[in-house]
């Protein structure tokens, strides 16, 4: 043997490359493999299929209660159970109340619907009554009902309170005027009008009068004010209720008009004074279009308004 020749102790098992349908080939080789399994292992260790590794997975299981802590032993076991019973009872009562309130709301809605249906049927019954009764009798009964409702409304406590408050509101200014008059005018006779000689003495001052101050009674108001106050008081008592309301509104409107007139007068006074914006030079004056005396003539097809500024 030459030196270049390689010495092989064991033959190397090499497989030829072949492109074949391995699926069909594998199915054909399965019975042959079963037969060879009975025989002892072949010489080549590569023929044996490798073993699949076992996968260690966590088993799926549902949680369960522990029996050890299910019934703990303690001294406070009895009050806890009683508290739980009370809580359950309270919850049951609350639920019952809620259910009853819901039923009450439903019943109220049904009642309103029934009332509306009953009102819809009323005109038909009224027409039947009109056919059976005389129209004059029906009108008389209807007017009696209306009058009775008016009387009931006017005699209601809320209406009486409202009328009383409104009467007090309108009677306050009259009472104030009368109280002022009674305070300024005590129960005494009015002084007679002075004569001509007394007037002259009052006009011509003297030294004696200057040296000794006179403490005379206060001046009396004219008789016209008393008459006007008395007449307004009697007129306010005699006028009806609605007329007094209208008079009050008219008085308020008059006061608003007077206030507006005062504002307009003040504005008119302010308008007389103003700050001059221009300095008074000739170029500050604005020329109007009427001052332009020059007339433009048309130039062919061009209109005249294009030449104007």
From Swiss-Prot:
Modified residues annotated as Phosphoserine in this record: 44, 71, 74, 78, 165, 288
Spans annotated as Disordered: 1-80, 164-240, 286-309
Recorded coiled-coil stretches: none
Biased composition (Low complexity): 174-188, 205-214, 222-239
Listed Polar residues bias regions: 61-80
Remaining remarks: Present with 1140 molecules/cell in log phase SD medium.
Name of the protein this chain belongs to: Assembly-complementing factor 4
Organism: Saccharomyces cerevisiae (strain ATCC 204508 / S288c)
